[in-house]
Design a protein with these regions (language model features):
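Charge-biased, low-complexity intrinsically disordered regions
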Residues: 2-438
C-alpha cells in the first residue's frame, strides 16, 4: 500500500476549477471579441484606422466574394485567426461542459453528425445559387456557417431539455413532436428560396423532391423514435431535428441533380460512391479489429486513452500495476473500435479523396492556404490526399498513445468534433458539389 501511495504524488484538479490552458484559451477568445468590436466600432469612430481596414481586407471581403461570386479562398491572416479561435473554443467549451456536469458521452458526438451533413448540404445549395447571395446565402459561407449551425444546435438542445423536463413521463414523445415542428420550421425558412428556381404545378411539386424529401424526413423522425430511448433528451432532439433538416436541404441537392440549373451537367454517382465508400470500408475493417480489445477494457471499467479517475497523467506514467499494463497494451487496438475516433479518421480520408479527385479530374481549385502549399510541394493534388490519409493515421496514434485525465473526457470529445468540422464537413461538401458540377 505504501509503495502504491508513493506513486501518487499529485491530486487531480477539481472539475469546477479551470486550468492555466483553459484560462489562456478564454483570454484568446475574449481578445478576439474585443478586436472584433473595436474593428466594427472603428468604422464610425475613426474611419480608415488600421484595425478596421485589416478586418475588411482579411475577413469581410473574402466572405462577401465567396457568397456572391464563388470561392474566394482564404489568406494567411484569417487562416491563423480561425485556427487559433477554433482550438480556443474547443478548450473553453470542454471546460464549461465539465464544470456544469454534462456527461461526456460518445453518443453526444454521434448526435451532432446530422448537423455536419446539414451544413454540408446547405453549403452545396449555396454553391448552386439556390439561396440569395446577398441574404440567406451568406449564412452558408465559411466561417459564418459554423456559427449558424451552432445557433441551431444550442437552441434545439435547450428546447429538447426543457420540453422533456416539463413533460413528465411522455417527455420523449414531446421531443419527437418538437422535432417535427422544427422540420416544418426549416421547411418554411428554406423552401421558398430553394423552390423558386423551378416552375411546377401542384402535381409536379408533390411528385418532386421538393415535397418528397422533407416528407421522407418527417416519416424518418417518427420511425426512429423507439430507437432513441438510450439517448438523452438533448441527443434525441438533435438527432431528429438534424435528420429532418438534412432532408429539407437534400431536396435542393436532388433537384439540382435531376433538373440542373445554369447549364450545369451533373456527373455520375461513381466518384461519390468511391470517395465515401473506400474510407467506409477501411473504417469498417478497423472497427471489427478493435472490438475485442475494447470489450476487454470495458469489462475492467476502463476506456481507451482515459486515465482512471483520481490519477493525474504524470502519476499514471509512473505506474507499473496490472491495470496500467492492461490499459497500455490494449488501448492501441481498442481505439480502433471507437466509433467517434473512426469518424474522425473517416472525415480526413473523405476530405483527402474529395480534394484529390476534384482538383485532378474536375478542374476545381483549392481555397485553403496550407492545403495549396502541400499541393504545390507535392506537384499533384494526390499529395494532399496522401497527407490526409497520413493525418487519419495520426488521429489513431494520438488516441492510442496520448492519455487524457478523467476530467478531460470532454476535451477528448471536443477534439474529435473539431476534427469532424475540419475534415468530414468540407469533404462531404466537396464531393456533393462535385457531383452537381457547381
Amino acid at each position: 500500500m505504501s509503495e502504491t501511495n508513493s506513486l501518487l504524488q499529485e491530486k487531480p484538479m477539481p472539475d469546477s476549477h479551470f486550468s492555466l490552458m483553459e484560462r489562456g484559451a478564454a483570454t484568446i477568445i475574449l481578445t478576439g471579441i474585443i478586436l472584433l468590436v473595436g474593428a466594427i466600432v472603428g468604422h464610425d469612430v475613426a474611419p480608415g484606422n488600421i484595425l478596421s481596414e485589416s478586418y475588411d481586407t482579411y475577413f469581410i471581403e473574402p466572405h462577401s466574394i465567396d457568397s456572391t461570386t464563388g470561392d474566394a479562398g482564404y489568406n494567411p491572416v484569417d487562416t491563423v485567426s480561425y485556427s487559433l479561435l477554433l482550438v480556443s473554443f474547443v478548450v473553453v467549451i470542454s471546460a464549461w461542459l465539465r464544470r456544469i456536469g454534462v456527461p461526456p458521452r460518445d453518443e453526444s458526438i454521434l448526435a451532432l453528425m446530422p448537423w455536419i451533413v446539414w451544413a454540408s448540404l446547405g453549403e452545396v445549395n449555396e454553391d448552386g445559387l439556390l439561396f440569395d447571395p446577398n441574404g440567406m446565402g451568406g449564412l452558408f459561407v465559411s466561417p459564418l456557417i459554423h456559427f449558424h449551425v451552432a445557433v441551431w444546435v444550442i437552441l434545439i438542445g435547450w428546447m429538447s431539455h426543457n420540453v422533456d423536463k416539463k413533460s413528465g413521463f411522455d417527455g420523449r414523445t414531446k421531443v419527437t413532436q418538437l422535432a417535427v415542428i422544427l422540420l416544418l420550421l426549416q421547411w418554411v425558412i428554406f423552401m421558398p428560396q430553394i423552390g423558386q428556381h423551378w416552375e411546377q404545378d401542384i402535381l409536379e411539386w408533390v411528385q418532386s423532391p421538393l415535397f418528397l424529401s422533407p416528407f421522407a424526413g418527417l416519416l424518418l423522425i417518427v420511425l426512429i423514435h423507439p430507437f432513441l430511448e438510450c439517448c438523452t433528451a438533448i441527443e434525441q432532439g438533435l438527432i431528429q431535428a438534424g435528420i429532418g433538416g438534412c432532408f429539407v436541404h437534400l431536396d435542393g441537392w436532388l433537384m439540382l441533380y435531376i433538373e440542373p440549373l445554369n447549364n450545369r451537367e451533373p456527373i455520375s454517382m461513381l466518384p461519390f460512391l468511391f470517395i465515401v465508400g473506400v474510407p467506409f470500408v477501411i473504417c469498417a475493417v478497423l472497427w471489427v479489429t478493435g472490438q475485442e480489445a475494447r470489450a476487454q477494457l470495458k469489462h475492467m471499467g476502463l476506456e481507451a486513452c482515459i486515465v482512471p479517475e483520481g490519477i493525474t497523467v504524470e502519476d499514471w506514467e509512473r505506474q507499473n500495476s496490472s491495470t496500467w499494463e492492461r490499459l497500455e497494451s490494449l488501448s492501441p487496438i481498442a481505439v480502433l473500435g471507437s466509433p467517434v475516433v473512426l469518424l474522425g479518421m473517416y472525415g480526413q480520408m473523405v476530405d483527402g479523396l474529395a480534394t484529390s479527385v476534384g482538383l485532378e479530374n474536375y478542374g476545381y481549385g483549392e481555397k485553403h492556404v496550407a492545403s495549396q502549399w502541400v499541393i504545390d510541394v507535392a506537384g499533384t493534388a494526390w499529395g494532399f490526399g496522401a497527407l490526409k490519409f497520413g493525418l487519419a493515421a495520426m488521429i489513431w496514434w494520438l488516441f492510442a498513445y496520448a492519455r487524457f485525465e478523467y476530467r478531460h473526457r470532454h476535451l477528448r470529445l471536443l477534439v474529435l468534433l473539431c476534427l469532424l468540422v475540419v475534415g468530414l464537413a468540407p469533404g462531404l461538401r466537396d464531393v456533393l458539389r462535385m457531383t452537381l458540377d457547381v
